[in-house]
A protein has these predicted regions:
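A helix-coil-helix interface module used to build multimeric assemblies
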Residues: 1-141, 145-158
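Acidic-glycine-rich active-site phosphate/pyrophosphate-binding loop
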Residues: 153-169
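A conserved active-site cap/scaffold subdomain adjacent to cofactor or substrate pockets
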Residues: 172-180
Length: 180
């Protein structure tokens, strides 16, 4: 099942009473399960880093989506300004000294083009999370249930448009955040 849209708000509400971020996520996710026996199994396989890396990935996706819309609006404004000031001559500078002439439209276009490139890069980046337990090896998972946990984890994360970091230690490296 898809995660509810209000999950972050629910987690924050629960966190007020638990004073523990991961426990709040566990309890909020547990509310999705109708059968009580499954509610109690949510945290059995996962470490705080598994839950946190997933949470970070979701937050980064939300930031990515929100900033793409905002940056797209800025690009649109810059594009109008570029056209409006295409012929407005001005003196450019290099090393703080007067240089050859340019136009204000061309200079605005420099920033518009850079933002367009960043939007393109942003759209290509994929949020990742680990889901393999204490050392990233699915040890507890395999001990309790002999399943293909990489496939199960990949499928679960994909439902939230998050890519599985298949090779990790206890900590997901968060490389995708640096790539943003």
């Amino acid at each position: 099942k898809k995660l509810p849209k209000n999950l972050p708000l629910k987690v924050k509400e629960i966190e007020k009473t638990t004073n523990h971020d991961v426990k709040a996520v566990e309890l909020a996710l547990g509310e999705k399960f109708k059968q009580k026996e499954f509610k109690n199994l949510i945290h059995i396989f996962l470490t705080s880093e598994d839950v946190n890396s997933f949470s970070y990935a979701i937050m980064m996706k939300e930031i990515q989506n929100a900033s793409q819309n905002w940056v797209q609006e800025v690009i649109s404004i810059l594009n109008k300004m570029r056209s409006k000031y295409a012929d407005l001559a001005m003196l450019s500078k290099t090393h703080g000294q007067p240089a050859s002439p340019t136009t204000l439209g061309k200079e605005i276009n420099v920033f518009k083009t850079r933002l367009e490139r960043e939007i393109k890069t942003m759209k290509q980046l994929q949020a990742r999370a680990k889901w393999g337990g204490a050392t990233g090896n699915y040890n507890v998972h395999q001990l309790v249930f002999k399943k293909n946990w990489v496939t199960i984890s990949r499928k679960f994360l994909k439902e939230s448009e998050v890519e599985l970091c298949e090779v990790s230690t206890q900590i997901e490296p968060h490389d995708f955040m640096a790539e943003q």
